[in-house]
Amino acid sequence: MQRSHLGGIIASLVVLVIAGLLVFAYQTRDKNGNNAPITAVGSTALQPLVEAAGEDYQKSHPGTSVTVQGGGSGTGLSQIAQGAVSLGNSDLYAQEKKGINSKNLVDHRVAVVGIMPIVNQEVGVDNLTLEQLTAIFTGKITNWKDVGGNDQKIVLVNRAAGSGTRAAFEKWAMNGATSKEAQEQDSSGMVKSIVKNTPGAISYVAFAYKSSDVTSVKVNGIMPTDENVENGSYPIWSYEHIYTKGQPTADTKSFLEYMQSTAFQKKYVEKLGYIAMNKMQIDRDINGHVTHK
């Protein structure tokens, strides 16, 4: 009886030790970033690319979970600065966003996004100068006939204040001017839908949202194409940034390296309407200074 009782105690202790080791191993893996879930939040312009990367990465890395959410660049930068997510996606440099402590944020550029004005197909305009765009979005021009279009009231559709696409558009299309107060939308997809269905509407979206049901507007006579961004002739574009708080964990670093790899850039970046980093013939810093490679 005593021997049997002792054996039971030993067996129970063995089970407890094994369970403890398993819990410790799990906690260690999670702490070190191995197989920990990856959550990316922010730019809706960058969202389709990160979603494609996440889906593909999970197939080749079983056990890794990649969750991608929009919300705009401001949300992404705020969340990553707080350490609430793994990755913060942004169309602008963290230093450009007011209220963001960028000191501990590390920038990983993964693509370039062109941004184009779009208008409802009935306005009768397919080309605008930077000066005209500024006048329209600041409310100085309110009728399409004043820029060569139909006699129709201009309806502004803006991205939300925290949008990186909006910040990039105001910086590079409007020379830093602030858009007039108008209806705002959180996503590029919704913006495109509203412009399509609203007479007189104008807004702006990333090239990835280009479609035949709205008119893509030339800027200073230059078509919004990848080639024209690459050679520097088209002015409205931005780098797509993914920020980490400090150096990335092992899994997060692996995911970022995958997105920056030649294989991924060739397979997905251009296919989804972005511009590969290695295709750029110029480099532009945060102040707009351009150097040719």
Q: Where are the language model's segments positioned?
A:
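Exported/periplasmic ABC-transporter solute-binding proteins
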Residues: 2-74, 78-82, 86, 90-293
